[in-house]
Design a protein with these regions (language model features):
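Alpha-helical lid/collar subdomain of P-loop NTPases
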Residues: 196-355
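AAA+ P-loop NTPase catalytic core and its hallmark functional loops
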Residues: 1-212, 217-220
């Protein structure tokens, strides 16, 4: 299965494992909660989806790579303890707490979360001396004498032996204790993730054209030659930073991430062409609705590669605006909730809110720091916390004369925040409408329109914005996309029917 399907499977398993009966006990006993084992090539996003699942479920997350662990670090260090049996004192062997189990307790203490995911990567690379202990751990969640705390679910991962020399296959006894999920590199699944997270449009459009360059591992006379999803994702982030600093993105940089000489060279050539398209088409003017007719005509006459690049530029620019608008809207909703709680805590209308503001600022900052340290701070939460803290900071500055801060003044500052959001939403709605107008003028209802509608549909920020604020052109063209998909499905069924009749 692809990484998107794997995420759904794991998330469903986590929900089942976390379910409790009427008495608060987990419905599936610990020894029957099979650890999930993700088996797949390196760099396809196994660790990333586990972090996302932990954030989605709002549970703790601890990640460990097993490659560097010895028997002592995994099980704990032995020491001599005194025990009395039948009135006779004996020296017995005990173990200190496992480094891994201790990390789980540390995470619980830091975040206050009693439930979480313990993710152990490269588990099929452990040393042979650790294998018997791992077998016990996989079934009973015990390292040495210490058990994984109740409420913490074990997920493991590893690479097949053909990708990792130190990896070894498990025997049937081990496989029979695991919930195995085989993950394959899949561009279509990664593309949805890339659109949502804002992967550089040059990377996205290049891979739209050269899909077989998405993931490749080869053995050459010079050693391994490879390119992975992780490589493209990391290259994308670096390209954005280079562009912000006006540092050239060249083949030397690309080759540090895309470790296949041929693909690195071809992408370097494509990127140079892409930057030319970006300068020529002036995407900002398209979204402002002020693109010149010559730009529309050039797009209409453009070759396939240029059209793909242009649509990538448009959807990337739209995606950034949609993401920012949705995150700001959720930040305003979060701030409204905090202010409502503050208002309810005041005993007198328009009372001095200064003590509550200070208390709220300290609480939010502590919450932000804790979730960041635990790796549970999503971008949406970060923006919400920072916007609320900025609002509180502005309110606290109103106490410059030492007379306190009436709640009405806090409400006025929040009103300015809402006005700024309304202006942003109006601007994004206009940009969305102008993008559809441009694509209609240049390409009518061609494949480019289907690409625009599809990219908006798989982008959760795009769909959140459109569902909340509407977009008539999106809904009209989405109907066309549904008819197209139904027609394609019908044609596929007819082809299968014809094939069956021929075979008969």
């Amino acid at each position: 299965m692809d990484i998107r399907q794997a995420k759904d499977q794991i998330k469903n398993a986590m929900l089942a494992y976390f379910s409790k009966d009427e008495f608060g006990n987990y419905r599936l006993p610990t020894e029957r909660q099979r650890p999930v084992f993700l088996l797949g090539a390196p760099g396809i996003g196994k660790t990333a989806i586990m972090e996302q699942i932990a954030q989605d479920l709002d549970v703790g997350f601890v990640s460990y790579s097993m490659t560097h662990h010895t028997r002592q670090s995994a099980l704990g260090l032995p020491f001599i303890a005194k025990k009395t049996y039948d009135g006779v004192e004996y020296d017995v062997s005990e173990y200190t707490m496992s480094e891994i189990i201790a990390a789980v307790y540390d995470a619980m203490e830091a975040t206050g979360k009693r439930e979480g995911i313990l993710f152990l990567d490269e588990i099929n690379c452990v040393s042979e001396t650790l294998t018997p202990a791992m077998l016990q751990f996989l079934q009973y969640k015990i390292f040495g004498r210490h058990r994984v705390p109740d409420g913490w679910i074990v997920v493991t991962a590893g690479n097949p032996p053909e990708y990792n020399r130190t990896a070894h296959d498990f025997d049937i006894a081990t496989w029979d204790r695991l919930k195995r999920i085989d993950v394959e590199p899949d561009f279509a699944a990664w593309r949805d993730f890339a659109v949502e997270t804002g992967v550089h449009p040059a990377v996205l459009t290049y891979l739209d054209i050269e899909r077989d360059h998405f993931y490749r591992v080869e053995t050459t006379v010079d050693g391994k030659s490879f390119v992975t999803a992780r490589g493209w994702d990391d290259l994308s982030a670096m390209m954005k930073l280079y562009e912000e600093q006006d540092i050239p993105v060249d083949e030397l940089l690309i080759g540090q991430y895309v470790q296949n000489g041929e693909i690195a060279k071809r992408f370097s050539v494509y990127y140079d062409l892409f930057t030319k398209y970006r300068a020529d088409y002036q995407i900002e003017r398209i979204l402002e609705g002020s693109a010149e007719q010559s730009v529309v005509e050039r797009a209409r006459e453009a070759a396939f590669d240029e059209r793909v690049s242009l649509m990538g530029l448009i959807t990337d620019a739209l995606g950034g605006r949609l993401r920012d608008a949705v995150m700001e809207e959720r930040a305003v909703e979060f701030a409204h909730g905090r202010l409502a709680a503050m208002r309810d805590a005041l005993t007198v209308d328009d009372a001095n809110a200064l003590p509550l503001l200070r208390e709220e600022a300290a609480s939010l900052q502590a919450r932000l720091d804790t979730e960041r340290k635990a790796g549970l701070l999503s971008d949406e939460k970060y923006v919400a916390y920072q916007r609320a803290l900025a609002l509180i900071d502005r309110a606290l500055r109103c106490d410059a004369a030492g007379g306190g801060v009436p709640f009405s003044q806090v409400k006025a500052l929040f009103g300015e925040m809402v006005d700024a959001l309304d202006a942003r939403i109006a601007a994004v709605s206009s940009a969305l409408d102008n993008a559809f107008r441009f694509v209609e003028d240049a390409f009518r209802n061609g494949q480019e329109m289907l690409l625009l509608v599809t990219d908006l549909s798989v982008n959760r920020y795009g769909m959140a914005f459109i569902n909340d604020h509407g977009c008539e052109r999106y809904f009209a063209h989405n109907e066309d996309l549904l008819f197209y998909e139904r027609g394609a499905d019908l044609a596929d069924r007819i082809n299968r029917l014809d094939l069956t009749e021929d075979e008969a």
